[in-house]
Amino acid sequence: MRYGNDKTENEIIESVIGFEPLYESMMKCKKGVLWKNQPAHYYLNGIEETIKLSDQLRNGTYKPRKTRKVKITYPKPREAVANAFRDRVYQRSLNDNVLYPAMTRSFIDDNMACQKGRGPDVAMDRLDEFLRQMFREHGLNFWILQGDVHGYYPNMSHDKTERRFHRKVTKPIYEMTTNVLRGQYEGSTGYNPGS
């Protein structure tokens, strides 16, 4: 087992496609979008829609709906992929219940990017600790390198990403993940997280 816990493969799959995890994902996905027709319809029929989605995932008849490409201009111009609400519910369940824990387990403590309980405030506190330590050890005789990886997600290799998932998750979860990614992103490079 690649997760470092005692769950069986069926329990792991159920933690993604079972009614409760999908319903919980719907509750998270609905925030701020219930004014739109598709999310409102799904939410108003939440129990029925979630049972239907769970059954489709269980019996292999689930097919993601066509994605739409959307241009975003703020805070910086970029292209995003808009998924159908039910597809977002499934993807959120897959991410929150299996992928996120499996992938972040190996991150260094100082990685603050897109992690629960981390963010700008924690990063600033950690930077403050480092600066104080460097000042104690070196006075004013030290340098800081500030950098940003420009175009990281748009240039990310699909093959490399899939290999990383393959190393971290079981085969059924890997297949679920690659089906989502391949269905949503064309070509051999580029992702748009948060879409």
Which residues does each predicted region cover?
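Generic hydrophobic/packing signal
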Residues: 57, 74, 98-102, 131, ...
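Non-catalytic, well-ordered alpha-helical scaffold segments
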Residues: 10, 20-23, 47, 51, ...
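Non-catalytic, polymerase-adjacent accessory regions of viral genome-replication enzymes
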Residues: 1-51
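Active-site-proximal segment of RNA-dependent polymerases
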Residues: 2-13, 95-154
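Short, conserved non-catalytic motifs in the polymerase core
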Residues: 33-40, 65-92, 106-118, 181-195
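Conserved polymerase palm-domain catalytic core
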Residues: 56, 130, 134-195
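Active-site-flanking structural segment that lines cofactor/substrate pockets
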Residues: 47-77
